[in-house]
Amino acid sequence: MNLNQLIIAFLAPRDPAAYTDTAIAQRLNASRMLDRRCTADEVAIALCDLHKLGLVRMNVNKLDDITVWMITPDGAREWARCGRVTVV
């Protein structure tokens, strides 16, 4: 699976929870489902790509300027279409 698919596999089963790019990168690295470690910056770029496709959405907390990401209904459908793989 590629990074985008794994991000969806991480977020979809945890809906409606939201996570930072750093938290997502840490969890993906801990899962060892990628062939190499990913950085928070790589995850942030992938999240922006997924956002453009309507598969994730972001929410910026205006008090502390932290961006969190969550799955959209379209993202959940894509996750189901791909076999509902879950990142634990």
Language-model features and meaning:
Residues 1-19:
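Short alpha-helical segments that sit at the start of domains
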Residues 18-30, 34:
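Short acidic, hydrophobic short linear motifs in intrinsically disordered regions
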Residues 51-61:
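A short, conserved structural fragment
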Residues 63-71:
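Minor-groove-contacting beta-hairpin "wing" of winged helix-turn-helix DNA-binding domains
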Residues 2-7, 39-42, 67:
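N-terminal positioning helix adjacent to the helix-turn-helix/winged-helix DNA-binding module
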Residues 35-53:
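Short amphipathic alpha-helical interaction segments
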Residues 71-88:
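Short, amphipathic alpha-helical interaction segments positioned at domain boundaries
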